[in-house]
């Protein structure tokens, strides 16, 4: 029986039946993310080629995709504290997924909109990422609650792996539609089907999960819940500063896709398949770093700046083979960033402040993404200088991260065997 049990955050053994019950909500959120990522990540590799088709330059592509990522991250500073104050975590989660479900299929209209097509596409691309900003802090609080008993490193990694499975299936679906029709409009329109499926599953999950979510999430706001300053420990802020620098160096995939189709000679229909490969690499990176995090702590994140520094010399190389390798490195880096980083924040911050913490942290990442979009767009034609700039940014990120890891009172090894610290 011991082989069929696992340990909860309190350190007690969980029988197989209870294990399935504890993992059920985690898998449920993962399936919602799977369907939603078929939509969002199915469209994402076409952002650069679509904007280029509509007349955008490398600078415009960099700014639009950078602004989209900045919105996805930076606006969480608004929606994270808002979710904490109101405790309406489900409302924000539903609204955010709904915005993505609307914006992405409407990209089908952009090539048909004439001179307004570039503006329409830019607004919808950014709108999709605004939806992510609305839902992400609230959804992550819900996910942090349901992963507490199964180990946050593993829980977030399993959820992220399902999420990334959708990010693989979406581009494969888009590639198949492009191969069959040659039309980006048809490809975007097809994504209305998984969008509807994601919303159906989310409403179904809403009816079943409340009993699995700790009272701390659904309770009325405690006194002083509108004061996020309690999450601003020195270690947390240093960690966020490191995130600014690594985000500034992590190129948006729209720029990579622009490069692949305009410089490396890769057909547009192949780009979604390359993105699918990147998401497979991201899933492996998320799982590996999650397991290492649970066993060895936050030092697992030191690999992130090193991976990011390797992206531009590979992904923006003129040779397609090197560019393909760079896409895989890019995917691995995003997998670590999107899963293990969140697990650490959940362990650093009390439950009543996690929405605020995710929002504040994401604001640093968003500011970095916006700066990075401008950096890549303006230096795209001077790649040696771009490679040097990214290397310097990642050296700074690595150094600040090392200091942050010393400042943070190291979250205890084996987070799956501990409760949150209530600093």
Task: Give the ranges of each region predicted by the language model.
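Symmetry-related core transmembrane helices of the 12-TM Major Facilitator Superfamily/SLC fold
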Residues: 186-204, 387-404
């Amino acid at each position: 029986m011991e082989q069929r049990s696992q340990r909860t955050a309190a350190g007690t053994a969980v029988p197989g039946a209870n294990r399935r019950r504890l993992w059920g909500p985690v898998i449920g959120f993962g399936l919602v993310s799977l369907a939603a990522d078929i939509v969002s990540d199915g469209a994402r590799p076409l952002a650069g080629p679509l904007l280029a088709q509509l007349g955008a330059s490398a600078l415009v592509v960099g700014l639009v995709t950078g602004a989209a990522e900045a919105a996805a991250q930076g606006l969480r500073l608004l929606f994270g504290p808002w979710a904490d104050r109101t405790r309406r975590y489900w409302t924000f989660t539903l609204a955010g997924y709904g915005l993505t479900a609307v914006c992405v299929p409407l990209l089908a209209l952009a090539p048909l909109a004439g001179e307004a097509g570039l503006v329409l596409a830019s607004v919808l691309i950014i709108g999709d990422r605004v939806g992510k900003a609305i839902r992400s802090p609230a959804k992550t609080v819900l996910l942090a609650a349901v992963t507490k008993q199964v180990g946050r490193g593993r829980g977030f990694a399993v959820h992220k792996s399902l999420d990334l499975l959708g990010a693989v299936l979406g581009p494969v679906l888009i590639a198949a539609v492009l191969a069959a029709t040659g039309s980006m409009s048809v490809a975007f329109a097809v994504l209305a089907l998984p969008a509807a499926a994601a919303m159906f599953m989310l409403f179904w999950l809403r009816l079943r999960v409340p009993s699995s979510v700790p009272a701390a999430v659904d309770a009325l706001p405690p006194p002083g819940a509108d004061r996020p300053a309690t999450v601003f420990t020195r270690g947390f802020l240093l960690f966020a500063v490191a995130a600014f620098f690594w985000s500034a160096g992590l190129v948006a995939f729209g720029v990579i896709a622009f490069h692949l189709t305009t410089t490396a000679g890769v057909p547009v229909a192949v780009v979604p398949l390359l993105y699918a490969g990147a998401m497979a690499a991201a899933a492996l990176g998320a799982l590996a770093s999650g397991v290492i995090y649970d066993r060895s702590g936050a030092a697992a994140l030191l690999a992130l700046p090193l991976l990011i520094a390797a992206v531009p010399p590979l992904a923006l190389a003129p040779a397609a083979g090197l560019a393909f390798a760079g896409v895989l490195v890019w995917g691995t880096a995003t997998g670590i960033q999107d899963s293990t980083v969140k697990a650490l924040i959940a362990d650093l911050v009390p439950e009543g402040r996690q929405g605020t913490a995710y929002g504040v942290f994401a604001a640093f990442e968003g500011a970095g993404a916006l700066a990075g979009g401008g950096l890549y767009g303006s230096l795209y034609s001077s790649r040696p200088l771009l490679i040097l700039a990214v290397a310097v940014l990642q050296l700074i990120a690595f150094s600040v991260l090392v200091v942050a890891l010393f400042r943070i009172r190291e979250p205890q090894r084996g987070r799956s065997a501990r409760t949150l610290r209530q600093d």
